[in-house]
Every structure is written in C-alpha cells, then in structure tokens.
Regions:
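Alpha-helical segment of the N-proximal tetratricopeptide repeat
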Residues: 19-43
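Feature detects intrinsically disordered, low-complexity acidic/polar segments
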Residues: 65-149
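Hydrophobic h-region of N-terminal signal peptides that target proteins for export
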Residues: 7-16
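N-terminal, post-signal-peptide region of Sec/Tat-exported proteins
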Residues: 39-82
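Positively charged n-region of N-terminal signal peptides that target proteins for export
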Residues: 1-5, 107
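Absolute protein N-terminus
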Residues: 1-2, 16-19
Length: 149
C-alpha cells in the first residue's frame, strides 16, 4: 500500500516539474519573439536547470544566443540539442543552425558538414540545400585564394 502512495506522489512531482519546465520554455519563446534576448536566455536556462537534456530548451537557447551574436555558446546548444534529440525534424533544425553559426565564423568546412547532416535529416529543405551550396562555394573560393597566396 505504501508503494502505491509513493508512486502517486512521485508521479505528481514529475508532472509538476515538467509543467514548470514547459512554462519557462513558453515564456522564453515569447520574450525571444519580442527581442528580449537576455530575459529569454534566463527563462531557457531555468528550464534547463530542471532538465539539462531538454532538446527544445537547448535549441531555443541556441537561437537566442545566436541572435545575441554569442556564436560559440549558440553552437554548443545546437550541438547539445541534436545530440539529445531523436526527432529528425529537430535534428535537422539543430544541424542547420550549426551550419549558420559556422558560416558566420567563416568556418566553411564545418558549415558544409553541418548542412550535409541537416539534409540527411530533411532532404527536402530548400533553404538548407541553398545554404549547403553556398557553403561549398565559399569553401572552394577560400581554397582558390589560399592557393594563390
């Protein structure tokens, strides 16, 4: 009989934690949309303090950090998001965003790889296909410039 009560208490506790986590993510999303990136970051970090493996919170925190031009931290969050996520559409998003970070940093070999991984998870995304082609073009241009030096 005691096990039954313990199970019920644990179930309610876990449900409350999940709701709290989702509330932080939801609030962070609203703040991000309003371009309140510092406040959005705080909300996503609160969600991650409850569950550090939440791929949505990691992805959204990465987006917020990207908008704040903190590309290294953003990339870490995108990497974590794709690592913790089994959903192909979310993996696609994470790899696509990692490619965007690498493009900003002019790290074209890594951008090409990231976009390639994004396309493996969603081969129909035209934007990713375009970015992949652009990254390959920039990589070739960089190689030619290095050769001419």
């Amino acid at each position: 009989m005691n096990w039954k009560y313990i199970f019920i208490i644990i179930s309610f506790s876990l449900k409350a934690q999940a709701e709290k986590e989702n509330n932080y993510i939801s609030k962070g999303n609203g703040l991000h949309e309003n371009k309140s990136y510092v406040d959005a970051e705080a909300e996503f970090r609160k969600a991650l303090s409850i569950n550090q493996d939440n791929p949505i919170a990691n992805q959204n925190l990465g987006n917020t950090l990207y908008r704040s031009e903190d590309y290294d931290q953003a990339n870490q969050r995108f990497f974590r998001s794709q690592k913790d996520n089994l959903d192909k559409s979310q993996k696609h998003l994470a790899f696509h965003n990692m490619g965007n970070v690498f493009m900003k940093k002019k790290d074209y070999p890594k951008a090409v790889e990231a976009y390639k991984n994004a396309l493996r998870n969603n081969p129909k995304d035209d934007e990713t296909r375009y970015n992949y082609a652009l990254a390959k073009e920039m990589l070739e241009k960089e190689k030619k410039e290095d050769k001419n030096k």
